[in-house]
Design a protein with these regions (language model features):
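Glycan-processing catalytic domains of CAZymes
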Residues: 21-421
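Hydrophobic helical h-region of N-terminal Sec-dependent signal peptides
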Residues: 6-18
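N-terminal secretory signal peptides that target proteins for export/translocation
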Residues: 1-3
Length: 421
């Protein structure tokens, strides 16, 4: 079995490297496979005021961790990382990184180029403070530099979680103006555009959990229409709406007010959130029949673009200690691959993979510790051998490279993963 896996890994490696482009075309969304990029990890060596943000509640320990997966940091200089007090891997200290370090972000983008990946949707949070924005600007600057250095494309994706009903829309508009006028994001040569306008994604409107504004669909539509056509020309965008999974039927995770249908129809691109909506391979196929295909038919009728979201697996035990460990197994990549195949077979021409660096919910696609012995001795860790397979740390980058090539029209995407341990 291991010989079969190694041979398949070699095939994937060669084809992924061959697919690497010097510069991704930033003038169109069509054919793109984009990752969500959190960029929210911090550590004291990079930012004494930031602490161990998103790694742990306080100093990392078995009791305080909020991540289940440990990144493979073997390619990073120790000077660019933070040693974790009291955590070890064998007889050596364990390390973590900060996205405020430009070299860390550059390494991530170098991986994207090496494996032929298109780029990222950079997460930006409306519900934060002015300090949060300033810290986000540091990471954004790093991303802009890394994009320039590697030819990967990027676009902003606002997460409105925690936004206030009466202020979030104005905050978003003001911040977008700031990004255009001051940060000059849309003037960057690799900022993603579509039909001559910069791409902007807004995630969270329409969710029925009461935690994501606005409550009134008319307010959502007003914001969408301002961004698409009502704003001064320099602020107008091709709009991606990060919507509930059941946006079309207004059920389950979606707000039920019928007015939301008009809000969704106003969006240039619909990107439904699917994390945790299915857990097994049969459920993935049922999702294609019951959701993907009807969604695509509806959007095609309305002249809109469909951007499905796929994910490699899910676990957030350390973040939510009452939850199970590894409740949505990765199945050696088969779970991710089948979602990509189904999206392509249904007719989708663009795709989002959640996420590049999300180790809190174990959806990370970047290099991850392969074996338990490569993660810290202290605490629970979900490593790539959890499914009984001997996988390299870059396995999911290689799979993403193959998926990207398929969406570029460079290769077919078969229903079965080409590598079986």
């Amino acid at each position: 079995m291991k010989h079969t896996l190694r041979a398949a890994v070699l095939v994937l490696a060669l084809s992924a490297y061959a697919g690497a482009a010097d510069r991704v075309d930033p003038t169109t969304l069509e054919g793109k496979v984009l990752f969500g990029y959190q960029g929210w990890f911090d550590c004291p060596a990079a930012n004494p005021k930031g602490g161990w943000s998103h790694w742990a509640r306080g100093v990392p320990s078995a009791e305080t961790l909020v991540i289940d997966m440990y990144p493979d940091l073997s390619e990073f200089d120790r000077a660019d990382l933070c040693a974790v007090p009291g955590m070890t891997i064998g007889d050596k200290p364990a390390y973590l990184f900060s996205a405020r370090n430009a070299k860390v972000v550059m390494r991530h983008f170098e991986w994207m180029k090496k494996y032929g990946l298109d780029g990222v949707l950079v997460q930006r949070f409306i519900g934060g403070t002015a300090r949060n924005r300033a810290e986000g600007d540091v990471v954004l600057h790093n991303i802009m530099a890394a994009s320039a250095g590697t030819g990967r494309t990027f676009a902003i994706e606002y997460d409105i979680s925690g936004g206030k009903e009466d202020t979030f829309a104005q905050q978003l508009q003001d911040d977008w103006k700031y990004l255009v006028d001051k940060a000059k994001v849309t003037s960057h040569p690799n900022y993603l555009h579509h039909k001559g306008k910069p791409v902007l994604s807004v995630w969270g409107m329409g969710l029925g959990d009461g935690k994501h504004p606005p409550a009134k669909p008319e307010d959502a539509r007003k914001l969408v229409e301002w961004l698409e056509s009502g704003a001064p020309a320099q602020y107008r965008v091709t709009y991606i709406g990060g919507t509930p999974s059941y946006w079309r039927t207004l059920r389950r995770d979606a707000a039920s007010n019928p007015g939301w249908t008009a809000a969704y129809r106003a969006m240039d691109v619909v990107q439904p959130w699917t994390i945790g909506r299915y857990k097994t391979m049969p459920q993935v196929d049922e999702w294609k029949t019951n959701i993907l295909e009807p969604d695509l038919a509806e959007l095609k009728k309305n002249g809109q673009i469909y951007m499905p979201v796929i994910f490699p697996g899910f676990s957030w035990y350390n973040l939510n200690r009452d939850s199970a460990k590894n409740p949505i197994p990765r199945l050696r990549g088969e779970f991710l691959w089948r979602q990509a195949y189904n999206a392509r077979a249904a007719g989708a021409t663009v795709l989002k993979i959640a996420m590049f660096d999300e180790v809190n919910e174990s959806t990370a696609m970047f290099k991850i510790a392969s074996k338990r012995t490569q993660a810290p001795d202290q605490g629970f860790w979900l490593t790539l051998d959890a499914d009984g397979a001997d996988l390299p740390s870059d396995w999911y980058l290689r799979l993403a490279g193959e998926i990207t090539r398929a969406f570029h029209g460079e290769r077919p995407l078969p229903p079965e993963l080409p590598a079986h341990p």
